[in-house]
Every structure is written in C-alpha cells, then in structure tokens.
C-alpha cells in the first residue's frame, strides 16, 4: 500500500512540475506575441509542448496537461491567423518553419496549429495540408500521446474541412467533401488503433484499471464519427464510402469495448434516413462483432431510434396538416372544398413515414431473428429485451396491423415457452416481469383491445405467466378497456376476453373487490346491436361469473340489468320467433337472480332485481313475466326479510314499482296489490303499518297517463286503506307520533279529493281536520315530559332537522301548511264545502 501511495505521489509531483513549466512558458509566449516576437513565442510554446511527452502521467492527468496546452495553442493559432491576414507573416512559411522543431511531439502540435489556421485562409492548399498533417501524425505511435495528438488534429481542423464537390472550381486545390471524409476516416482508424493499444500498456494485473481509463477516453475516438455526421453527406456517399470504412475498422479491431461503443455511436450520430437505407449493413455488423459484445444494447438502440423517428415525423406531418387547414380556413376569399378527403382513422404512422419499398417490417424482423440465432449463448433476458423493442416498434408504428406484433408472440411461444430446456427459467422473477411488460405493450399502444384478440399467440404467452402476474395483466386489460371506451361486439371477442379476466373472477376473498367492480363495469363495453348475439354474450358472462363463488353478487347484477334493458331491443328488432326469444331472455334473468339468491348474502339485491325486471316486463307489455317477477319478489319478502326496518324499506320499494305498472289484467293486479296491502298491515311497528297502508292506497288509484285512458281505480278500497291507517294512527300511544301520522293521512285525503275520488267526500276531510286540530290543542296543553316520540322515523326528517324549532312547533307548522293548501282552493265550490 505504501508503494502505491508513493507511486501516486510521484505521478502527482510530475504533473505539478509539468504544469509549472507550461504556465511559465505560456506567460512568456503571451508576452512575446504581444511584442511581435513570433520566433520567441514559438520557442516558448515548444518548451511547454515538450511536457506532452511525459509518460508517467495517467490518462486523466495527461488530459489535464493537454487542456492547459490547448489554451495556449488556441491563443497562438488565433494570433497567427491574424498576422497572416494583415500581411505581417505568411502561414505557409511558418508551417515550413515549425517543422524544424527539435522534438516530434512539439513539432506536430505546432504544425497542426499553424496548418489548421492556414486551412481557414483564402486560396489555401487545403488538400495538400490535410494529407501532410495526416502523414506527419503517424510519427507518434505512443497510444496515449498519439490519441491526444490526433484529437487535437480533429478539433483544430473542424472549420477548415472542405465541403465542396468535384464539379467546383479549384477542387483539386481546395479539396472536396470526399477529402474530408477520407481525412476523418483515416484519423478515426488511427485513433481507434491507438485507443485499443492502451490496454496493453503496463502489467496485466492493472488491466481492469486500464479498461476503465479507456472507457473514459472513448469520447475522443467517437468524436470522429460525430464530425462525419456533421458533413451533410448524401446517402450514396454515406453508404458507399463512409459506413464501409468505419465498419471495416470496427470489425478488424476485435476489441469488445471499442466495437460496442463505436457501433452505438454510429446508431446515435447519423441521421434516421441514412439508417433506414443501411439497416442490412448495420445488423450485419452487429452479427460479426466479438462474442463478448453486448449486442442487445445495439439492437435495442437502433429499434428505439427508428420507433422515435417514425413517431416524431408522423406527429410533425399531422401538425403541419392541421396548421395548413387552419390557415386555409382563415383566408376568407378562398373557397374551402367541402369534399376534402378526411384523414384515415386507421392510418399507421409507419405507412405514412417510411416508403413501402423499404419493407421495414420484414427487414427488421428478419434481422432481429438473425441476431438472436447467431448468438447461441445470448441470455434469455437479453432475448426478451430485443423482442420487447421490436414489438414496441410494431405496435407504435403499425398499431392497426396486429399481424406484425403477433410474430413476436409467436416467437416467444415457440422458442421460449415451449422449449423444455427453458421451463425452469420461465419461473424466475426477472424473466416473468420482462414477459409481463411485453404483454402489457399491446394494451398500451393498440387502439382497442379487439386488436389484442387478433393476436393468436397472445393468450398462450399470457397463460404461461405466474398467477399473480396474470392477475396484474388481467387487471390492466380491464382498466384499458374502460379507459379507452372501445366496445367489443363479437361473441368470440367476449369469450376470449373472459379467458383473460377469469383469473380476477375466480380469485377468492375480498382483496379483489375493486377489480371485480371494474369487471362489472367492463360488461357495459360488450355490446352488439343484434339482440340475439347480445344475449349470447350475456350468457357467456353469466357462465364465467358464477365461478366467482361468494363474490358473484358483485358481478351478476350487471348481467341481469343488461338483460332487462335488452328486452326493449327485442321489441325494436322483431324477428320471426321474437316472442320465444323474449321468453328465453326472461327465463335467463330469473336464472341469474336465483344464483344470487342461493348465494344467501344478496337478499335485498335479489328483491331489487326482481322488481326492476318486473317493471321492465310491464313497460314492454309482457304482463305474465312481470307477474312472475313480482311473485318472486314477494316470496323473498315473505321468507327471507326478517328485520322490521328492512321490511318497511323493501315494502316501500314494492309499492313504488307496483304503482307504475299499467299492463296487468285486473285480476292479477288486484291480487298483487291486495297482497302488498296485507304486508303493510302486518308490519311490526304501528307507525310502519300506518305509513305502509296509506301509501298502499295509491295502488288502488292509478293516475291516467297519455297512453293509459282507463287506469285501475277502486275508490272504495282507497277509503278503506285511509280509514284503516287512521285507526292505526289513533292507536299509537305516543301523541306526537299519532299527530304526525294524522297530518300525513290528511294530506292523502287532500290528494284523493283533488283527484275526484268518489269515496273521499268533504265531510270526511272536515272531520279529520277537526280531529287533528283537537289533537294538536291537546298536545299544546300537555306536559312536555309526557311528549316522548317513540318512533322518530314516523316524522319527516326535513321537519325535525330544522334548527331552533321544537317538535311541536314543527307539527303545528306542518298542519297549518296542509290546511292552508285546502283554504286556497276554497274558491272552488267542492273545496269550500270542506270548511262549511
């Protein structure tokens, strides 16, 4: 350890000494440049550059020394160019002069400084100087010194590289873009060789350290390729001259670090259009790389780049079209053609951006498969990563052509899932997550889930996953269907969808309730305009949902409700055997509700569903089915509803549904409402009995509607209900409860009197008003301690919740409002007789 510290201290000391010499020489050089003593400035700069021969420095320390000298050389080069332009000195003479420097490293740095300045002057012998500099730089073969020397050559000549063509005047002297290509390619080749040789410097035990140092220096080599990409080359030059030369050097160097980095630079530096026309060369190169190269990264990088290119160009074209349409609309003097063809909603971005003659789908897929097959030892996770990238390309660039994406799933199914040697690896968590991510891609990028169902190999890959991952994927499927709002209309689509979501349905316990609710919501997106197909879809849903066990109560109700409203469609789309189909539909509804009833924990739900079915059956004029559903609801009420509070609430629901019916025969309707009134009279609590009976009176007095000219009305039974409710109200021991019920019954009398119910006469109302007012006076003189409301539910909550108003005051106000209503109608002779 002490030896290592001593060596590091010596290297640091050597760097400090070199920097001190460079700083002193730089100050002297600047002073001589200011006084015009150019030869002395060269001498000072040369002394500073001699330190670039220091072999004791690490690459990082050498870079520090290099950057300091670059600043001095930049100042020198700027001054030289200025003196040449003002005629003080001639750069060509200076170029020959600096070649007499004693040491090769300072000599070449000075030659590059003077030569690069000369390249920027008019009438410069560009081609000659470029070739000379390239040849002279071969004189430094030390890997580190040569690498930085050529990097300096690259940076200094950037502005002076020719960009013209052979057709231009003085092309032989000024050079052409091909000369620039040759210059950069040769410099790249030599720099790469030097970079690769760095690994052989020093002892073998420091190989990993040198590899790390090489990794830090790779940008110096890659800059050559970046400069090539900035020459604005045409595709022919790139394909015929640039790329082959670069690829040749990459393959010949046989260094995995260099190969991987440089191929990645090619992918990132050159334009997308160039890549599109040289994919064969790119992927052919990937196959020829050393076995230790991570080809996955190189393939994925190219696929991702092409995907982003297609998306970017497509969005740009769409934006330009929208702007063009906006401008056209704003030009009022230009008549807009109303028959402009609308954009095809199913236009694939790839079809619009990439010319069809490129056959990009076939080319990419064949190359991907070839790369995977050429690397027999490629890890499984790397294969999945490549497949994920090509799938991402197909989905984002060709979302309306699922046949391309299906190739990926077919490959996974045949070469991964069905391979006996890989079965153990399939259960590894990282691979499971990677396959899960692949399965989620179609859900993200396909316009609707129906396109996923066209993937014949999607379900086999899905079924091969771990149950927990299948559950997560199924949950995502349901969420995407709901989010995108696209309906699935075919029976086969619905059945295939259920094959995916069955993992949610069959999961036991309460942990999946939110997901089950989403499954129920998903049912609304399974629609077919043909009611016969729709009922088959609902049957498939029922057959799958019953596998949910005790959780079936969260799923089947939506099927029942969809069936109930489907009955209306059968009326609209009547076919030859529509009556038989309606019968089967109602039988199916009854079967579904029976499944819920047998579940034992859905009694209220079953009763509500029977009532909804009965209501729809009556509306659609199917009285026999409506009667059957009401009787089923009555059976549940009689046999299973035991809680008194629940009985009261359920009875109110039954009364409400029955009151809306209009298509029963008189006998059937009379049977149902008589039974309902009987239920009201058997409620446990007196106030409930009273309320139930006076509400049931409405069943005996239906109001005529537009289509119902002869509603069911039985004045005698109305009066009987009201009188019986009065008797029960009078029997209530609590005075406040009794009074409240009396007021409510009085309002019912007013209602039926207004409806011209023959059994309700003014004498009855007058007597009830007197009796109610008498009870009110009796309460007002009673002791407050005696007024204990035993059943607050008998009072309207809106009354009792009024702040700072006592119960008695509320009842008094209620009675006054009721009687005031009748008094306002006293102009009518019928109403005035009430108060006589």
From Swiss-Prot:
Its main location: membrane. It is a peripheral membrane protein. It is found in: Membrane. The keyword Iron-sulfur does not apply. Keywords: Membrane, Phosphoprotein, Protein transport, Transport. Disruption phenotype: Leads to sensitivity to thiabendazole and microtubule depolymerizing drugs. One of its GO terms (biological process) is intracellular protein transport. The modification Phosphoserine is found at residues 316, 318, 783. One of its GO terms (cellular component) is cytosol. The keyword Protein biosynthesis does not apply. It comes from the Eukaryota. Plays a role in vesicular protein sorting. Required for the endosome-to-Golgi retrieval of the vacuolar protein sorting receptor vps10. Required to form proper forespore membranes. Belongs to the VPS35 family. Component of the retromer complex. This is Vacuolar protein sorting-associated protein 35.
């Amino acid at each position: 350890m002490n030896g290592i510290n001593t060596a590091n201290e010596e290297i640091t000391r050597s760097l400090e000494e070199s920097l001190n010499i460079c700083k002193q020489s730089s100050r002297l050089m600047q002073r001589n440049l200011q006084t015009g003593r150019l030869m002395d400035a060269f001498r000072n700069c040369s002394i500073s550059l001699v330190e670039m021969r220091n072999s004791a420095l690490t690459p990082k320390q050498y870079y520090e020394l290099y950057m300091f000298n670059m600043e001095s050389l930049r100042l020198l080069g700027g001054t030289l160019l200025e003196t040449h332009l003002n005629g003080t000195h001639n750069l060509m003479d200076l170029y020959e002069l600096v070649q007499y420097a004693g040491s090769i490293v300072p000599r070449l740095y000075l030659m590059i400084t003077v030569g690069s300045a000369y390249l920027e002057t008019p009438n410069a012998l560009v081609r000659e100087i470029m070739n000379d500099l390239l040849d002279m730089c071969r004189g430094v073969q030390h890997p580190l010194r040569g690498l930085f020397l050529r990097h300096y050559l690259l940076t200094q000549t950037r502005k002076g590289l020719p960009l013209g063509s052979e057709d231009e005047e003085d092309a032989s002297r000024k050079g052409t873009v091909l000369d620039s290509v040759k210059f950069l390619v040769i410099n790249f080749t030599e720099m790469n060789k030097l970079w690769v040789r760095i690994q052989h410097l020093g002892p073998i035990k420091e190989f990993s350290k040198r590899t790390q140092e090489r990794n830090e220096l790779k940008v110096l080599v890659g800059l050559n390729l970046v400069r090539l990409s900035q020459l604005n080359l045409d595709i022919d030059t790139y394909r015929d001259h640039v790329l082959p030369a670069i690829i040749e050097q990459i393959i010949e160097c046989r260094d995995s670090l260099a190969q991987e980095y440089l191929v990645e630079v090619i992918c990132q530096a050159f334009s997308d259009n160039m890549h599109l026309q040289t994919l064969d060369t790119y992927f052919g190169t990937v196959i020829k790389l050393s076995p230790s190269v991570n080809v996955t990264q190189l393939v994925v990088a190219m696929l991702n780049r092409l995907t982003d290119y297609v998306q970017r160009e497509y969005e740009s074209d769409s934006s330009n079209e929208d702007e063009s349409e906006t401008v056209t609309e704003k030009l009022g003097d230009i008549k807009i053609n109303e028959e402009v063809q609308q954009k095809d909603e199913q236009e694939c971005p790839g079809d619009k951006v990439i010319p069809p003659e490129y056959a990009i789908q076939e080319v990419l897929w064949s190359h991907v498969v070839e790369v995977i097959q050429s690397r027999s030892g490629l890890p499984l996770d790397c294969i999945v990563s490549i497949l994920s990238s090509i799938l991402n390309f197909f989905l984002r660039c060709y979302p309306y052509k699922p046949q391309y994406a299906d190739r990926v799933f077919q490959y996974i199914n045949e070469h991964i899932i069905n391979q006996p040697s890989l079965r153990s690896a399939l259960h590894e968590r990282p691979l499971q997550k990677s396959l899960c991510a692949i399965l989620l891609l179609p859900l993200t990028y396909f316009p609707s889930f129906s396109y996923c169902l066209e993937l014949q190999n999607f379900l086999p890959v899905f079924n091969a996953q771990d149950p927990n991952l299948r559950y997560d994927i199924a949950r995502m499927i349901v969420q995407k269907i709901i989010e995108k709002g696209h309906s699935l209309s075919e029976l086969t689509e619905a059945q295939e969808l259920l094959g995916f979501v069955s993992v949610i349905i069959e999961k036991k316990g309460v942990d999946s309730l939110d997901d089950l609710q989403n499954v129920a919501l998903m049912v609304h997106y399974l629609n077919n305009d043909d009611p016969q197909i729709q009922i088959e879809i609902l049957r498939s849903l029922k057959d799958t949902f019953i596998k949910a066990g005790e959780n079936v109560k969260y799923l089947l109700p939506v099927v029942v409700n969809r069936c109930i409203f489907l009955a209306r469609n059968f009326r609209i789309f009547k076919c030859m055997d529509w009556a038989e189909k309606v019968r089967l539909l109602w039988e199916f509804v009854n079967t579904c509700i029976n499944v819920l009833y047998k579940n034992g924990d859905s009694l209220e739900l079953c009763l509500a569903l029977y009532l909804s079915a009965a209501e729809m059956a009556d509306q659609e004029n199917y009285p026999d089915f409506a009667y059957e559903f009401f009787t089923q609801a009555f059976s549940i009420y009689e046999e299973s509803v035991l809680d008194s509070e629940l009985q009261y609430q359920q009875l109110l629901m039954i009364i409400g549904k029955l009151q809306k019916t209009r298509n029963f025969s008189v006998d059937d309707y009379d049977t149902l409402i008589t039974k309902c009134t009987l239920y009201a009279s058997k409620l446990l609590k007196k106030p409930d009995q009273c309320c139930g009976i006076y509400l049931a009176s409405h069943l005996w007095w239906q109001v005529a509607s537009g289509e119902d000219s002869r509603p069911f009305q039985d004045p005698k039974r109305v009066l009987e209900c009201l009188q019986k409710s009065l008797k029960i109200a009078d029997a209530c021991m609590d005075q406040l409860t009794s009074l409240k019920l009396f007021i409510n019954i009085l309002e019912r009398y007013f209602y039926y009197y207004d409806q011209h119910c023959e059994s309700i006469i003014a004498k009855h109302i007058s007597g009830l008003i007197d009796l109610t007012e008498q009870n009110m006076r009796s309460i007002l003189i009673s002791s407050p301690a005696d007024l204990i409301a035993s059943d607050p539910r008998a009072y309207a909550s809106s009354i009792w919740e009024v702040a700072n108003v006592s119960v008695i005051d509320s009842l008094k106000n209620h009675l006054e409002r009721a009687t005031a209503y009748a008094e306002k109608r006293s102009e009518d002779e019928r109403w005035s007789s009430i108060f006589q």
